[in-house]
A protein has these predicted regions:
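N-terminal targeting leaders characterized by basic, low-complexity, disordered sequences
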Residues: 1-4
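Mid-to-C-terminal functional-domain signal that highlights helix-capping/loop sites
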Residues: 6-396
């Protein structure tokens, strides 16, 4: 090129390499579209894991009574409820396991055992760890089987409120390190119509041919504390759930032996990987409670204390069983119950009701009931959470 030659610069064409840049641009656009699709379609998870105000719940009437109300680090529905699971007769479990690469339920696995009107069902804790809430129906009763792994607490409720069954989910929030659920009200309430821009929603009873279709107004959900069995915020704040009696946590071997006609729930297809990854065994073995506790009772401040019915000073994570009958409560450690009920049934009285404890060792497994078939409330949990929810100021 001479001094008088035109200034010719190389140009990038599609064939000479421009296709690489074009492809990169398309990939960037696809990634951005994927990243924002959930937001644009309203599917972005609610809750940033840190601030309770980001979870989309009405907290204007929040009732914690001194308890520590915090975010769990996970968004709402990070653990999704298991709704109306498939079930298998318990006596078929051996054959079911034989078809699997990894066995589903074995003899030493812990389960939540529920019995209603002569029908029994087991909910393995490995499944509960990845769902925390199971919306089910047993013997015609709609129930919510709930498990808070941080507290090792299992409670089962009749999920009807004002005669209507609710669906419960995992809010991603905690009260004194305990599970806080929410009701999926929008799925079960009646549609409402708005008569004007300023009018309050009214129930849509009928619609004439010349009327517009009703406008669906999704009502706000309420928050429910597992240990309190009560709504702590939202439209039905202060409402309590009916606790299903005679619920036990024991080994699958123990439950099947005492309930030979039991069923057992089956996991969702996608649960297998999560069940392998999610384990609380290390957490339960160390002494630290990971989330803050706002209330801590002494034996003198516990609700319904009676002489010799409350253990003395214990580690926060000591497994206990709270037995409530006749207006009184007795709390025993899992170890004591396992030791005293192993060779022969351990019998004592709570609130005038004869209680019988039958246990197995290695691993410790305990079944608690009343010898005269009186319904009793049995609450297996860790000691710290029982204290937190049974002070005079706790929601109850």
């Amino acid at each position: 090129m001479t001094e008088n030659s035109p200034d010719i610069r190389p140009s990038l064409t599609f064939r000479s390499g421009g296709w690489v840049i074009a492809l990169a641009g398309v990939l960037v656009l696809l990634i951005l579209a994927w990243a924002f699709a959930g937001i644009l379609m309203g599917h972005r998870p609610k809750g940033d894991g840190q601030s309770v105000d980001t979870y989309g719940f009405d907290l204007s009437n929040l009732r914690t009574n001194g308890g520590a109300f915090v975010a769990s680090g996970n968004p709402r529905d990070f653990f999704q409820s298991l709704d109306h699971p498939k079930v298998l007769p318990g006596h078929e479990m051996l054959a079911y396991n034989a078809k699997l690469r990894s066995k589903y339920v074995v003899t030493a696995d812990r389960v939540i055992g529920v019995e209603i009107n002569g029908k029994s069902r087991a909910y393995p804790l490995d499944v509960m760890n990845v769902h925390e809430v199971v919306n089910d129906e047993l013997a015609g009763v709609p129930i919510a089987v709930t498990f808070s792994p941080l507290c090792d607490s299992a409670l089962v409720f009749d999920r009807r409120v004002n005669g209507k069954p609710l669906q419960f989910g995992v809010s991603g929030l905690l009260l004194d390190s305990n599970l806080v659920m929410y009701d999926k009200q929008a799925d079960v309430v009646e549609h409402t119509s708005l008569n004007s821009l300023d009018a309050k929603p009214t129930t849509q009873v009928s619609m004439n041919a010349d009327q517009s279709p009703p406008v669906s107004a999704a009502p706000a959900s309420s928050l429910w504390s597992q240990m309190a069995g009560m709504a702590i915020a939202g439209p039905v704040g202060g409402t309590t759930l009916t606790q299903i009696p005679n619920v036990n946590v024991c080994t699958w071997k123990h439950w099947l032996a005492t309930h030979p006609t039991t069923e057992v729930i089956l996991p969702d297809a996608q649960d297998e990987k999560r069940m392998k990854k999610i384990s609380y065994s290390r957490y339960l073995l160390n002494s630290k409670v990971e989330f803050p506790i706002g209330r801590k009772a002494t034996a003198n401040t516990l609700i319904n204390p009676s002489s010799d019915n409350m253990p003395g000073a214990m580690p926060d994570k000591m497994p206990v069983i709270a037995i409530t009958a006749g207006g009184e409560t007795r709390v025993v450690t899992l170890r004591e119950a396992a030791d005293r009920g192993a060779d022969a049934p351990w019998n004592f009285v709570v609130g005038g009701v004869p209680i019988v404890v039958v246990s197995q060792k290695d691993p410790a497994s305990v079944l608690v009931g009343s010898s005269d078939t009186t319904p009793i409330q049995v609450t297996p949990c860790l000691w710290f959470v029982w204290q937190a929810f049974h002070t005079p100021t706790a929601p109850h």
